[in-house]
């Protein structure tokens, strides 16, 4: 549905669906089989930076790759929103609600083994991992490569108990895997981000989150509203 929606509405210049079947043909899968065969998020989403770097191979310097979870649906207005932002910045990363502190959704080992175990990382607002845009630049290739390296370290990305001997923070809920990693990297490199939690003025106005997830047979979308005929939320 996502691929068809993007193509029919010409939201972006092209769309490439990446599947589990595609992943199984890659050396990346063989090298990281232990993590990728875990059921949780199809292998803790460690394929995400790999997919973005793979897509970089088919575009020119300065072009933009947009990653989007297959369960989300973009408004037709998203193209302009992303284009306007990326004309001034090299990344489009979506910040969650300000109450979602990184330390409550990141296990301690993720901070420790990324050399990010300090207050500015703990208290950062966590990013949304289901949508992001990256301009192909040499710096972004380096950052995404670091993202990928961290994602392939089971101490950092998986739910195994902390190996560092450090405890999780008070108020810890659960680990958010690749999302925790990209949040640490955003703070480390001061990457560009936008508000996503404001329905009408933030990125949340242009994306229907988890639109294809079903609960009790009924489609729902994390409370998102419907769009009007102009492609924006009512």
Where do the language-model regions lie?
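Glycosyltransferase catalytic domains, chiefly GT-A lineage
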Residues: 1-234
């Amino acid at each position: 549905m996502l691929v068809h929606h993007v193509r029919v509405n010409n939201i972006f210049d092209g769309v490439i669906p990446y599947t589990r079947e595609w992943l199984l043909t890659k050396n990346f899968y063989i090298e990281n089989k232990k993590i990728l065969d875990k059921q949780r998020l199809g292998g803790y989403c460690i394929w995400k930076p790999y997919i973005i770097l793979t897509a970089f191979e088919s575009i020119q310097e300065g072009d933009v790759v947009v990653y989007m979870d297959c369960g989300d649906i973009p408004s037709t207005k998203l193209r302009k929103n992303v284009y306007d932002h990326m004309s001034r910045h090299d990344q489009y990363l979506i910040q969650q609600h300000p109450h979602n502190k990184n330390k409550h959704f990141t296990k301690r080992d993720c901070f420790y083994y990324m050399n990010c175990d300090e207050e500015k990382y703990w208290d950062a607002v966590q990013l949304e991992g289901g949508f992001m845009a990256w301009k192909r630049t040499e710096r972004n290739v380096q950052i995404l490569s670091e993202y990928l390296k961290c994602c392939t370290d089971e101490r950092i990305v998986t739910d195994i108990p902390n190996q560092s001997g450090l405890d999780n923070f008070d108020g810890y809920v659960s680990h958010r895997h690749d999302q925790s990693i990209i949040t640490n990297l955003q703070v480390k490199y001061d990457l560009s981000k936008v508000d996503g939690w404001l329905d009408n003025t933030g990125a949340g106005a242009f994306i229907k989150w988890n639109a294809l997830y079903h609960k009790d047979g009924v489609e729902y979308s994390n409370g998102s509203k419907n769009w009007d005929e102009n492609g924006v939320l009512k």
